[in-house]
Regions:
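Chalcogenol-based redox active-site neighborhoods
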Residues: 1-151
Length: 151
């Protein structure tokens, strides 16, 4: 996990429609940048739907939500359409941003050890500085917790 108080690494990734986004495009806004393991899985779906349901509240507070996983653009599009997600999903199939943000880690699941994305959420301020980082994310609680951070 990256340290608080540092400049968030800039990046450029395609969204669910294939449109390229840079973190620097969002200068002047707060950014909730959350990394999740996989589209259409139970925890990831809860988290995404929670952010989507609260999306108007985030925009009222001047924040944007960017969800990142190693899934493809096409997978993100299906995920967005299936659940009517109201925010941007970014495809990092080469894991460049996932690794830059230090969320590609060894994970243990039911005794099996493998490498994967550790669910992590960063709050980045209007100047691009990381002001909050959480790698102990509970998928269902993350959207509400991040909304409280903006209060």
């Amino acid at each position: 996990m990256l340290e608080l108080g540092i400049k968030a690494p800039d990046f450029e990734l395609p969204d669910q429609d294939g449109v390229m986004h840079k973190l620097s495009d969002y200068a002047g806004k707060k950014v909730i940048l959350y990394f999740y393991p996989k589209d259409n899985t139970p925890g990831c779906t809860k988290q995404a739907c929670g952010f989507s349901e609260r999306y108007p509240q985030f925009t009222e507070k001047g924040a944007v939500i960017l969800g990142v996983s190693k899934d493809s653009v096409a997978s993100h599009k299906r995920f967005e359409e299936k659940y009517g997600l109201a925010f941007t999903l970014l495809a990092d199939s080469e894991r460049k941003v996932i690794e830059a943000y230090d969320v590609w880690k060894e994970k243990k699941n039911y005794g099996k050890v493998s490498m994967g994305v550790v669910r992590t959420t960063y709050l980045i301020d209007e100047q691009g500085i990381i002001i909050k980082a959480n790698d102990k994310v509970k998928a269902a609680d993350d959207p509400e917790n991040m909304l409280k951070e903006l209060a």
